[in-house]
Amino acid sequence: MSKPIVMERGVKYRDADKMALIPVKTVVTERTEVLRKPEWMKIKLPADSSRIQGIKAAMRKNGLHSVCEEASCPNLAECFNHGTATFMILGAICTRRCPFCDVAHGRPTTPDANEPGKLAQTIADMALRYVVITSVDRDDLRDGGAQHFADCISAIREKSPTIKIETLVPDFRGRMDRALEILNATPPDVFNHNLENVPRVYRQVRPGANYDWSLKLLERFKEAHPEIPTKSGLMVGLGETNAEIVEVMRDLRRHGVTMLTLGQYLQPSRHHLPVQRYVSPAEFDEMKAAAMDMGFTHAACGPFVRSSYHADMQAKGLEVK
């Protein structure tokens, strides 16, 4: 029997080590059991990677993180090559251990008080016009990291007054009142929180999260700021059905959410949850049509769509798939 892992502060636990810490266990996927990727899931890498390396260098120089790298996003090359990135604040170690996610789990260190300033300067240097700020879950902080979000928003706007800011926030479990009080005083231009999947599979996919809590977070922010778009995203391919996805879309509309993203789940490693199915582009088109019929102002639905994929285009209502 292997010894239980004793977490050390500041150490990243990934793959088998991370999964060993999850109460709901996953079965390691053997290579022969992996679903073959269909043709529509093949990615063509850009010929010129100089812009990609430039953005990575800027991140390293300022001690910043991107969710693009930490979560092994399949769109990293495309987004970096276009000069866009989703910044991940509050460190690169998450207090949650979701078995679909490639972000490291562990005991995070104290938030960097200089991060808002460094982030704002980096964004100004890159001359970005639209930026997405997300974070790991920080259940170790009394406000879940809400004040750090607010500090980052203020610092960015001070350096780049015309920029549009989208925040992709955690669920602030047990801290919603405190977090919303802070965020309501310094709101973003788009407020995003992902449901990730359907309630039936939450115990397996999002241990530690609560479907109704996440809906309430989105609803309460919208009630306080009816003029600000609220947004949420889901992955498909984790055992849900299309009918269940449509029902979640209805729940989102009932809670005031106006923007939607749907994308294909991809297994980061054989230790993570396996892909149960690949949803075809035609099915994504059908779900987008259903979303628009429900009254979403924008729905980005496609195999490679992620919550922050071409977020600037999503905010403008342009086609993204």
UniProtKB/Swiss-Prot annotation:
Its EC number is 2.8.1.8. Binds 2 [4Fe-4S] clusters per subunit. One cluster is coordinated with 3 cysteines and an exchangeable S-adenosyl-L-methionine. Gene3D superfamilies: Aldolase class I (3.20.20.70). One of its GO terms (cellular component) is cytoplasm. Residues 80-297 form the Radical SAM core domain. The keyword Signal does not apply. The keyword Iron applies. [4Fe-4S] cluster 1 binds at C68, C73, C79, S308. It catalyses: [[Fe-S] cluster scaffold protein carrying a second [4Fe-4S](2+) cluster] + N(6)-octanoyl-L-lysyl-[protein] + 2 oxidized [2Fe-2S]-[ferredoxin] + 2 S-adenosyl-L-methionine + 4 H(+) = [[Fe-S] cluster scaffold protein] + N(6)-[(R)-dihydrolipoyl]-L-lysyl-[protein] + 4 Fe(3+) + 2 hydrogen sulfide + 2 5'-deoxyadenosine + 2 L-methionine + 2 reduced [2Fe-2S]-[ferredoxin]. Its cofactor is [4Fe-4S] cluster. GO terms for molecular function: 4 iron, 4 sulfur cluster binding; lipoate synthase activity; metal ion binding. It is found in: Cytoplasm. Keywords: 4Fe-4S, Cytoplasm, Iron, Iron-sulfur, Metal-binding, S-adenosyl-L-methionine, Transferase. Transmembrane segments: none annotated. Pathway: Protein modification; protein lipoylation via endogenous pathway; protein N(6)-(lipoyl)lysine from octanoyl-[acyl-carrier-protein]: step 2/2. [4Fe-4S] cluster 2 binds at C94, C98, C101. Belongs to the radical SAM superfamily. Lipoyl synthase family. This is Lipoyl synthase. It comes from Erwinia tasmaniensis (strain DSM 17950 / CFBP 7177 / CIP 109463 / NCPPB 4357 / Et1/99).
